[in-house]
Amino acid sequence: MSSSPTVLELFDVCFKQEDVDSLKKPNWFTDVSIDYVDELIEHLWFPSYPNQANEILLLRPSLVFLLAEAAISPEELKVALPKKLMNCKYLFMPINDLDKHAAGSGGSHWSLMVASIPDGQCYYYDSLSNGKTKDCRSALARVSDLFKKKFTIECMPVQQQRNGYDCGAHVCAFTLELVRRLLHSPMPTSSMWNLSTFQPDVTAIREQLSRCLDHIINSLGTRVSGDFDEDFPTGTVFFDLESHLPLLDVALPVLPKSSDSSETSHESSNSNLKKSSESGSTNHHNNHESDKDLHHEGHHHHHHHHHHHHSHDDDPSSPAEKKQNHVPSPSEKIQDHVPSPSEKKQDRVPSPSNNKEDHLPLLSDEKLDKSAIDKIEPTPLPSVHMNSHIAKGELPKFHNSTDNPFLTPPEELVSGDFPF
């Protein structure tokens, strides 16, 4: 556990200085940063829609790790996890790739899995995706154990990050948007889970979360345990539930949706999701701030480097169509040319339903330098507080039990019908 002083105690969240700093770019979100967003959603948004809110469970990162990696039975898990778990319809699970690294060292990437319990469907959102779902499969298998049903997992197309540190910010943005939709839609359709056209401005979201933290400390103090007052300015300090989140003016790349899904069965769990199809040439305007982020990566922690290769469209007009220089004779009167409807250039408006023709670069496996990525040694997250408990063989502080056997290697966790 970090020895830095506590900046804020907000319900069950204990903010250290590094957690405060993690909200600002170019830093990775800590697990506490994600806890903070979940607490704000539960205390500022849920009271407005109590019936729908009762169906949603935002599972904290430390509990997701417990769910995925603890060598305990489903019955023991039910005791350690929130009582609401077995009655919820929609389970949000922020996934950290902690199992790739030594215990206590921290993971290097955040992604999001949401389980729709009645449908037996899991949706996976990854802002640094290659179309695979390896990081979430342990959690998926344990969810299947808990609810005694098989779940199909679908890798969803989402905005791809353009730097090495915004994965946690994207997870929070995806969570905010999906919760907002669920609260407004008591009977969600499959299209509600589609975030392919959702282009959040994660920089603006980071700034708003920092401002909200400052407002809480300045107006309520450094210890907040009771509910927020009804006059708390949620819409201006946090995010207005009735409005959209901050969005980008210029669209960033979206990973194409995988054409097949994987069930928690032997056949499907041993096969990767289909690789995303490669897109054609691209012609889009890059966000200036995103370009600066790419140059910052050499000076900060990051998990992967992506080099986006952008090609420019060729001139659409053929040589025969190009306008020739014309020098009129003295007797020739120059007429202004008004193009006919057939000559008018049609504006190209990207359509969410016509992704193949959009001028958006689509990230595919062939555009990634896999050998270079494999050689990169991920730098641990600045603070993943659950790791200190793990190193000591203790459960996270959120649990009452301290007697449960805790960790085994991930490959030994899954048995029976769910080999991964």
From Swiss-Prot:
Keywords from the named record: Cytoplasm, Hydrolase, Phosphoprotein, Protease, Thiol protease
Pfam family, one: Peptidase_C48
Parts of the chain that traverse the membrane: none
The enzyme's E.C. designation: 3.4.22.-
Chief subcellular location: cytoplasm
Start-end of Basic residues biased regions: 297-310
Annotated positions of the Phosphoserine modification: S329, S340, S351
Enzyme type, top EC level: hydrolase
GO MF term list: cysteine-type peptidase activity; deNEDDylase activity
Compositional bias per record (Low complexity), positions renumbered to this chain: 257-281
GO biological process: protein deneddylation; proteolysis
Subcellular location(s) per record: Cytoplasm
Region called Disordered, residue ranges: 257-420
Protein family (similarity comment): Belongs to the peptidase C48 family.
Primary role: Protease that catalyzes two essential functions in the NEDD8 pathway: processing of full-length NEDD8 to its mature form and deconjugation of NEDD8 from targeted proteins such as the pcu1, pcu2 and pcu4 cullins and other proteins.
Summary of subunit composition and partner proteins: Interacts with csn1. It is, however, not a component of the signalosome.
Protein name according to UniProt: NEDD8-specific protease 1
Organism: Schizosaccharomyces pombe (strain 972 / ATCC 24843)
Gene designation: nep1
